[in-house]
Amino acid sequence: MGDGLGVANLLAVLHGVGAGAMAGFVSGLLGVSPGGILVPAVCLTLGVDQHVAQGVSLIAQIPPTGLGGVSEYRRRGQGVPMPWIALLSAGFIAGGACGAVVAGYLSDRALRWSFVGYLLVLAVLAASRGRKQSTSMSEEPAVAPRRVALVGIGLVAGLSSGVLGIGGGLAVTALSTTLLHFGQHRAQAMSLILTLLPLTIPAAGVYVAQGWPLPWWSIAGVIAGLWGATAIGARIANGLPERVLRPTFVVLILAMAAYMASKSAQ
């Protein structure tokens, strides 16, 4: 990490805390893994390139920083069966390792535009689900989801995690509401529970092995910010109706896509 906590390292920690707190709050509020916010936030606050930002994001998501947020969702009755989490995790681990290897062969510009395209697809899926649900009173599936569907969602989330350096929660939330017909609160709870498991280790290990210059003091700050802010966001989310949460989720995705598109166009 360097030789002691000098002024430069202290600033790196504080910048990391700011990026982590921003990502953690949104993670708890919208039930997504923090990586989708963390990557652009790290690029903005630390001024690093896309590969380094993705490495920071993946490493910072190894500790169970979303524990407070998960507790808030469970306290409001939004539990998720552990067999579902196990199936998601199996797909995620396989996809994450493969995705990180692929990312190593892509340029920063290609990664950024891939990030933008991925976000736009998720926004369309989430918005489509919102329109369909407005005509139905049911917010939860009548039967348990098929195993292959959960593994498949985990695989897509893992691939996005490895290639784009995010936690995959955006994919879990968007796909579980669209394909499995989960209510927004249940989908967000499932996504956050997934963040408690150190599923980004394989992808993070690839980034470290490839020798990217990772800012370890900033990573420590990011972890601290994530830990403190996720529960606050989750507490607010549980007091909001679904008709508010879903449009907020879509707006967030579009805002992230717009920011990354502006970075890519420079």
Question: What residues fall within each predicted segment?
Answer:
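Small-residue hotspots at the loop-to-helix junctions and early N-terminal turns
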Residues: 50-58, 188-192
